[in-house]
Amino acid sequence: MVKTAQLLQTLNDQLSELAALVAPLAEHATLSPRFDRQLFHTRSTLMQAYLAEAQHNFNQLRQAVERQQLPQVVWIAERLAAQIAALRRETATWSLRSWDHASPTLSRWQRRRLQHQEYERRLLAMRDQRQRQLAQATSLDEQQRLGKEVEAYSGRLARCRQALDKIENVLARLTR
């Protein structure tokens, strides 16, 4: 039972780590579902939905362990491990995926959306990095410089999000 508890804890830790990796991409949509139905039941185009399904499977695994349903435990554990591996691969290769095929006008706007989502992710990462550096800065000059950089990144992020909202509105009109 101790070994099972350790394995559950390891899976829980992996899911927590994965949630942190997926967080910047969680609400970013793709043109089509990312995984086949054998691996994930959800047909969503949002990464958050796939992560939520993996979390749900982890909860089912925990319940199956408590009820000592060995065949279910084995099946759910294998499925969950495959889901975690697939989500890790997807987050690692996200920036390489520029777009999926669709109609020319629609695909151009969807490509723009994906581009802006990537800009947003990178701006968030840069702003967060500068905020961490600012928290650790010791000299006044360094604090002022980093403070200005954080403000600049926040402004860029706000403009990027405004552009994303406009793109989403155009896409909503095109797909009605």
Swiss-Prot record:
Gene3D superfamilies for the chain: 1.20.1270.340
Gene: priC
Keyword annotations from UniProtKB, A to Z: DNA replication, DNA-binding, Primosome
Organism lineage: Bacteria, Pseudomonadati, Pseudomonadota, Gammaproteobacteria, Enterobacterales
Assembly mode: Component of the replication restart primosome, which is composed of PriA, PriB, PriC, DnaB and DnaT; DnaG primase associates transiently with this complex. Interacts with the C-terminus of SSB; this interaction is required to load the main replicative helicase onto substrate replication forks. Interacts with helicase DnaB alone and in the DnaB-DnaC complex, probably 1:1 binding with DnaB. Interacts with DnaT.
This protein's name: Replication restart protein PriC
Entries under NCBIfam families matching the protein: PRK10093.1 (NF007500)
Family that this chain belongs to: Belongs to the PriC family.
Keyword Heme: no
Physiological role: Involved in the restart of stalled replication forks, which reloads the DnaB replicative helicase on sites other than the origin of replication. Recognizes abandoned replication forks and remodels DNA single-stranded binding protein (SSB) on ssDNA to uncover a loading site for DnaB. There are several restart pathways, the PriA-PriC pathway is a minor restart pathway. Part of the minor PriC-Rep pathway for restart of stalled replication forks, which has a different substrate specificity than PriA. Part of the major restart pathway with PriA, PriB, DnaB, DnaT and DnaG primase.
